[in-house]
Amino acid sequence: MTSFLSHAKINLGLQVLNKREDDYHNIQSCFVEIDLEDTLDFSQASSFQLSVDDADIPIDESNLISKAYRFIRIRAEKVQTEFSIHLKKRIPIGGGLGGGSSNAA
């Protein structure tokens, strides 16, 4: 098993710039990482699996970790290794601390 820390952040400033053709917006942001993190444990598996120690977090296709996995698999189709990820959630959900996007990154 390999573990990674996924740090929370606080935005010091955020400016929304122009809207892009994909309906997202370009932004300019200044943030600092804070001493609060989730832990992602990776293990080899026969197929992708996501588990979370918080029942309030969905583990379906709407989860940003699942979306990041699908994005990578499409672009790395020659890679045959599969893995499971277990998320130990410590960053508060919906607290504006960037936990979900940090987990996906």
Spans of features found by a protein language model:
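ATP-binding N-lobe of GHMP and related small-molecule kinases
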Residues: 1-94
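DPxDG-like acidic metal-binding loop motif
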Residues: 95-105
